[in-house]
């Protein structure tokens, strides 16, 4: 039995390597930017910080990323990294593919540098790290225990204490087990939601300050789910609304103004398997998406949750942890799966006619498949300052910063802007 499994693993490895070679050969035609970087340890989390600096006289801009480590029994860290991203007018020749490094392109003087700027000791791996929108120096993290930690990275030295002592600015108490979901309220400063394997969602207000030492107790604990709560997200336009999804296959909508924390305001059987992630559309107050172990992404309208608006199908394995709307385009959504693929979808193309040949590659709304990872993608983030730039991290230590070729998202035949495309609908 073991030898059969070993044989299957070897075959799969060979297929993955073959696919990667093909992907690499095609990168000059598919991308305007690809940067591949091997991290010292895998990161389970990634998020662009909103800050960007354009040094005078340079052909690049400086961007920052929040990362974490997942080590093999060594000290873990919360990491802030600095990234050089070439300007649009930087000399970039996509035909210079460096096959050994898996990188390509010459950016004039820029080689797409990625440097670790701040490392802060962390208790166990960083399951997820998210910055507070009102003050991006404040970062909340999920640990492998029940704790949620809050760090102000400006108050910590750039190099971690060699003793390994983890010294967060706040410890948030309320969960019994670990989890992944984490969401700051973009309308109410300091209000943080967290999802947990203990079947609950906790809400903290960090403005309330610690009761004892650095500990802040949960302001409310929401107990509607009957299984592991995988993800939680605040509505982006309503300060009291949030959604949660869980292994009980349900999507629940909650209102913090309600008198009850045990019953959601809306409940829907969202998928035929565990629901792993959700994301509210930043432009439309009614639209949200959920991703599931049933390999699909579902589109919902809050005005009628009985009816699923659309199902996106193309992933070959479960939508693991992440589905994110583009911060720049109302109709653009991305999802990543255990299938090592990151799919970018365009809602405005739903229902478009396509040839039989095109249909074999996927439905018309499947705009792009990023195939650069050879292991499961743990997290990804849209760059808030550079449209169409995504950073994705996978379980094999690889971090990729990439931007699909402009002719893929801009109609080649005409100079149609994205806003015009959005306006066309489906």
UniProtKB/Swiss-Prot annotation:
GO terms under biological process: cellular heat acclimation; chromatin organization; DNA replication; negative regulation of cell growth
Pfam name, any one: CAF1C_H4-bd
Record protein name field: Histone-binding protein RBBP7
Subunit structure, interactors included: Binds directly to helix 1 of the histone fold of histone H4, a region that is not accessible when H4 is in chromatin. Subunit of the type B histone acetyltransferase (HAT) complex, composed of RBBP7 and HAT1. Subunit of the core histone deacetylase (HDAC) complex, which is composed of HDAC1, HDAC2, RBBP4 and RBBP7. The core HDAC complex associates with SIN3A, ARID4B/SAP180, SAP18, SAP30, SAP130, SUDS3/SAP45 and possibly ARID4A/RBP1 and ING1 to form the SIN3 HDAC complex.
Annotated WD repeat ranges: 47-122, 128-173, 181-217, 228-269, 275-312, 318-370, 377-404
Crosslink feature (Glycyl lysine isopeptide (Lys-Gly) (interchain with G-Cter in ubiquitin)) location: 4
PANTHER family listed in its UniProt record: WD40 REPEAT FAMILY
SMART domains to which the protein is assigned, alphabetical: WD40
N6-acetyllysine sites (modified residues): 4, 119, 159
InterPro entries xrefs: G-protein_beta_WD-40_rep (IPR020472), Histone-bd_RBBP4-like_N (IPR022052), WD40/YVTN_repeat-like_dom_sf (IPR015943), WD40_repeat_CS (IPR019775), WD40_repeat_dom_sf (IPR036322), WD40_rpt (IPR001680), WD_repeat_RBAP46/RBAP48/MSI1 (IPR050459)
Compartment annotation: Nucleus
Modified residues (N-acetylalanine): 2
Phosphoserine modifications at: 3, 95, 355
Sequence positions bearing Phosphothreonine: 10
Gene3D superfamilies: YVTN repeat-like/Quinoprotein amine dehydrogenase (2.130.10.10)
Similarity comment text for this entry: Belongs to the WD repeat RBAP46/RBAP48/MSI1 family.
Covalent cross-link (Glycyl lysine isopeptide (Lys-Gly) (interchain with G-Cter in SUMO2)), residues: 4, 101, 155, 159
Keywords: Acetylation, Chaperone, Chromatin regulator, DNA replication, Isopeptide bond, Nucleus, Phosphoprotein, Repeat, Repressor, Transcription, Transcription regulation, Ubl conjugation, WD repeat
Role played: Core histone-binding subunit that may target chromatin remodeling factors, histone acetyltransferases and histone deacetylases to their histone substrates in a manner that is regulated by nucleosomal DNA. Component of several complexes which regulate chromatin metabolism.
Gene Ontology cellular component annotations, sorted alphabetically: ESC/E(Z) complex; nucleus; NuRD complex
């Amino acid at each position: 039995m073991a030898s059969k499994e070993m044989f299957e693993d070897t075959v799969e490895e060979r297929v993955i390597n073959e696919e990667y070679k093909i992907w690499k050969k095609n990168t000059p035609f598919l991308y305007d930017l690809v940067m591949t970087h091997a991290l010292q340890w895998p990161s389970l989390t990634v998020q662009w910080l909103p800050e960007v600096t354009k040094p005078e006289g340079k052909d690049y801009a400086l961007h920052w990323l929040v990362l974490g480590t997942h080590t093999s029994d060594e000290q873990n860290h919360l990491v802030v990294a600095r990234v050089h991203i070439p300007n649009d007018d930087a000399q970039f020749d996509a035909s210079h593919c460096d096959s050994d490094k898996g990188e390509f392109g010459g950016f004039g003087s820029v080689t797409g540098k990625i440097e670790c700027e701040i490392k802060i000791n962390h208790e166990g791996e960083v399951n997820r790290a998210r910055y507070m929108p009102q003050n991006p120096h404040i970062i909340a993290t999920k640990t492998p225990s029940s704790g949620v930690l809050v760090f102000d990275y400006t108050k910590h030295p750039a190099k971690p204490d060699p003793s390994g002592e983890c010294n967060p600015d706040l410890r948030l108490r309320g969960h019994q087990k670990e989890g992944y979901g984490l969401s700051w309220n973009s309308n109410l400063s300091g209000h943080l939601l967290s999802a947990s394997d203990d079947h609950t969602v906790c809400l903290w207000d960090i403005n309330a300050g610690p009761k004892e030492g650095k500990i802040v107790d949960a302001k409310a604990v929401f107990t509607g789910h009957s299984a592991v709560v995988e993800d939680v997200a605040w509505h982006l336009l309503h300060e009291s609304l949030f959604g949660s999804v869980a292994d009980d296959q349900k999507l629940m909508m909650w209102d913090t103004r309600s008198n009850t924390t045990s019953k959601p305001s809306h409940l829907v059987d969202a998928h035929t398997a565990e629901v792993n992630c959700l994301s509210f559309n930043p432009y439309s107050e009614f639209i949200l998406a959920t991703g599931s172990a049933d390999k699909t992404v579902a589109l919902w309208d809050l005005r009628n949750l009985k009816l699923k608006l659309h199902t996106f199908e193309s992933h070959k394995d479960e939508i693991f942890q992440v589905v994110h709307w583009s911060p720049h385009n109302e109709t653009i959504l991305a999802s990543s799966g255990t299938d090592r693929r990151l799919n970018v979808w365009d809602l405005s193309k739903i229902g478009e006619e396509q040839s039989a040949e095109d249909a074999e590659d996927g439905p018309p709304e499947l705009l792009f498949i990023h195939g650069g990872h050879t292991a499961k993608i743990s997290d990804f983030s849209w760059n808030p300052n550079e449209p169409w730039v995504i950073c994705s991290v996978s379980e094999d230590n690889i971090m990729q910063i990439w931007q699909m070729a402009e002719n893929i998202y801009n109609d080649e035949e005409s100079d149609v802007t994205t806003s015009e495309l959005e306006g066309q609908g489906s």
